[in-house]
Curated annotation (Swiss-Prot):
Keywords: Ribonucleoprotein, Ribosomal protein. GO terms for biological process: translation. Belongs to the bacterial ribosomal protein bS16 family. One of its GO terms (molecular function) is structural constituent of ribosome. GO terms for cellular component: cytoplasm; small ribosomal subunit. This is Small ribosomal subunit protein bS16. The keyword Aminoacyl-tRNA synthetase does not apply. It holds the Pfam family Ribosomal_S16. InterPro entries: Ribosomal_bS16, Ribosomal_bS16_CS, Ribosomal_bS16_dom_sf. HAMAP family: Ribosomal_bS16.
Length: 82
């Protein structure tokens, strides 16, 4: 099964997440199919907090991909901002 989920990057105590399409059996930070955005929870000032290609999300969901709970809320936020 294919899922759209977050992979963690960044330094210790300074998380930065990539939003990726991955097989649900692969490790959290392992192999992925496509990178479709990023999420920076600690963005300050003019830094971009969320960038997400909503068209690609819609395309993958149409193909049967599931969204993780957190990604579903981020997609909702991205649609509201656009």
């Amino acid at each position: 099964m294919v899922t759209i989920r977050l992979t963690r990057g960044g330094a210790k105590k300074r998380p930065f997440y990539q939003i990726v399409v991955a097989d649900s059996r692969s490790p959290r930070d392992g192999r992925f199919i496509e990178r479709i955005g990023f999420f920076n929870p600690l963005a300050a000032g003019q830094a971009e907090r969320l960038r997400l290609d909503v068209a690609k999300v819609d395309a993958w969901v149409a193909k049967g991909a599931d969204l993780s709970d957190r990604v579903a809320s981020l997609v909702k936020e991205a649609r509201k901002a656009a």
